[in-house]
UniProtKB/Swiss-Prot annotation:
This is tRNA-specific 2-thiouridylase MnmA. The keyword RNA-binding applies. Catalyzes the 2-thiolation of uridine at the wobble position (U34) of tRNA, leading to the formation of s(2)U34. Its EC number is 2.8.1.13. Keywords: ATP-binding, Cytoplasm, Disulfide bond, Nucleotide-binding, RNA-binding, Transferase, tRNA processing, tRNA-binding. Residues 145-147, 307-308 are annotated as: Interaction with tRNA. GO terms for cellular component: cytoplasm.
Amino acid sequence: MKAKVIVGMSGGVDSSVAAWLLKEQGYQVEGLFMKNWEQDDHNDYCPAAKDLADAQAVCNQLRIPLHTVNFSKEYWDRVFAYFLSEYEKGRTPNPDVLCNKEIKFNAFLNHALNLGADYIATGHYAKNTIEGSIGYLFKAKDREKDQTYFLHAVEPEALSKTIFPIGDFTKPQIREFAKQLGLVTHAKKDSTGICFIGEKRFKTFLNEFILAKPGEIKSTGGKTLGQHDGLMFYTLGQRQGLGIGGLQNSTDEPWYVVDKDIASNTLYVAQGSQHPMLYSQGLICGPIHWLADYENHLPLTCFAKTRYRQTDQACMISPPDNNLHYVMFSSPQRAITPGQFIVFYEKNQCLGGATIEQIIR
């Protein structure tokens, strides 16, 4: 009998088609819906309830069972606590990376294995190969939608227990499959933003958990230009929401965030999208989580992304120094952001990644 696969059903079109593709390939397919966040229940509109209803409708259409599980505690402890602590330090975290590492490819994987699954599957745009107990990660066919950036921190052992059914298809193909099948999710919009914030304004949401500390906005020359609402609300390269237009003796060029001084609680800004302070020659990152056997080949010349959907950038990774790596780029990089992740590639293979600790101007 063919292997049993439990698909993480999000209530979206990608996981819906992933489940159908696996069924077509002859696997024993079951669905599982994860609830990772409790606090949307008091809203008039509850996205989790709608997503569950859509996941159930798709499973009914495909005639597969749907399990449900609540990982809210695990999510709070392993993802959200980290998210808050990073913002309190004035950094800009990426909770999606942690959610994949800790919840989808850890808590969900273990739960599925306990339910008798041989593999899990998700609707991620990615590909993998499996050699024994190790999985290797590769970019999806649809480079616009490729999600390996968010998957770089998953353990290789977890990747060996994972199937990515939609990795060889483009998003338009996936939508067309869903439409032809008459799946209720075929026209559902892609989810964007941070999953647990939903429709709330980001500032309003953060204020519920962290006390904001307003401070001064200064030019790179040290001139006070205004007040910020709290460093946690701003990210490097940000242009909108600074509230400092129309200053005397300044041009009409827009202002951008170029630095955050945590010690003095100062936000530094500069004018012009090409201002030198927006650019970095390199960065210092933490320990690299390797998905391929390259750690003994340092220094290494390869490619990297410092944010999702960025074009791959040529770089060189240094050997570790006190668990930190220097990464230097072939050309200056704009708005590298501490707290975010740098992810390394060699052609189509994702080699792994690390947290960005500092920028090197």
